[in-house]
From Swiss-Prot:
GO terms for cellular component: plasma membrane. PROSITE patterns: COMPLEX1_ND1_1, COMPLEX1_ND1_2. It is found in: Cell membrane. NDH-1 is composed of 14 different subunits. Subunits NuoA, H, J, K, L, M, N constitute the membrane sector of the complex. Its main location: membrane. This is NADH-quinone oxidoreductase subunit H. Keywords: Cell membrane, Membrane, NAD, Quinone, Translocase, Transmembrane, Transmembrane helix. Belongs to the complex I subunit 1 family. It catalyses: a quinone + NADH + 5 H(+)(in) = a quinol + NAD(+) + 4 H(+)(out). Coiled coil: none annotated. The chain crosses the membrane at residues 16-36, 84-104, 124-144, 165-185, 197-217, 260-280, 288-308, 320-340, 353-373. NDH-1 shuttles electrons from NADH, via FMN and iron-sulfur (Fe-S) centers, to quinones in the respiratory chain. The immediate electron acceptor for the enzyme in this species is believed to be menaquinone. Couples the redox reaction to proton translocation (for every two electrons transferred, four hydrogen ions are translocated across the cytoplasmic membrane), and thus conserves the redox energy in a proton gradient. This subunit may bind ubiquinone. HAMAP family: NDH1_NuoH.
Amino acid sequence: MIHPDPTLFGHDPWWLILAKAVGVFVFLVLTVLAAILIERKVLGRMQMRFGPNRVGPKGLLQSLADGIKLALKEGITPAGVDKPVYLLAPVISVIPAFLAFAVIPMGGEVSVFGHRTALQLTDLAVAVLYILAVTSVGVYGIVLAGWASGSTYPLLGGLRSSAQVVSYEIAMALSFATVFLYAGTMSTSGIVAAQTSTWYVFLLLPSFLVYVTSMVGETNRAPFDLPEAEGELVGGFHTEYSSLKFAMFMLAEYVNMTTVSALATTMFLGGWHAPWPISLWEGANSGWWPLLWFTAKVWVFLFVYIWLRGTLPRLRYDQFMAIGWKMLIPVSLAWIMIVATAHSLRTTGHGGWASGLLIAGTVLTFGLAVILWRTMRFRADRTVPARTAADVFPIPPIPGRAGTARTPESRETTDA
């Protein structure tokens, strides 16, 4: 197992840095094309229908065809928009999505034409904070798109998105605090190295669950896709966008999904380390093999995105905000105190801290699941209150019949 040497960063030749940057870009673009196609295929199977199956063998070129179609369509700019901001908003959304992936470790040390280098573009002492900061910039593009469109629905979608990111990024940052505490670093390569023996998903299960929930809300995906709710806001912040500008918003969304999935892999699933029992093979974590394990873990999270979209209905806005502020943030704060206590026992030489942390995390997770289930069941089982006199309205008398009062129920029966 060869972990990257921190001194390697910043000493690669220029052509190798350029090659790694192009490699990261190609990896993200290919992942987006594959994710769109697989999402449509999987959703088709979930809904008992065929997915795209016309362009290319078994529809494999459908995503490429859609991208070319959007690029060649006429770009329509509606009247009344703030044109400079309207055109700049998609760019502001898509650039931070790519920049955030620069510090994600995709593997250990490899040899490229005789040069030893890490499968990571660069690393920082505060790499995770860099990712949080850069991904937060992307929401400015959404807000500006809603404001510059000069329409009510896009503006509401932009405001929803800003509130959503602020709410769920707090919970996401709190879920990272426990990882920093145990890894002793905010460097992404250092966090991966700290998980050589045990992945943090087992030690820090509540943090992992909080992060997974937050990352779905952060990327505006179902069931948290409130900024672009079709039934309420038509298309949300990108209602007035078409052609390549619309494609840039879609590209930013799927790149963000890939980035937060890669971050979850790095923080909780051991990064590029091979899973058990593959890790028993001596060469599993050397050479180019770690890139395969890393990609497989990222695709597990991307499938979770697809699964959630195909199975869960969209939440109401008040329910969504209540989950963030009333559940995720308080649970994260309580869990940080528990983890800090266990970490203190660890540093002072007391045994049993790992077992205690596992038990505490399991109990907390189970308790939250029970509370959430009981809450949802109580809401579903509530009886509808009896209608008051205000709900009953008179109707004109029918010739030959006495005047009656008609209720909404009787109207539905009559109309049927």
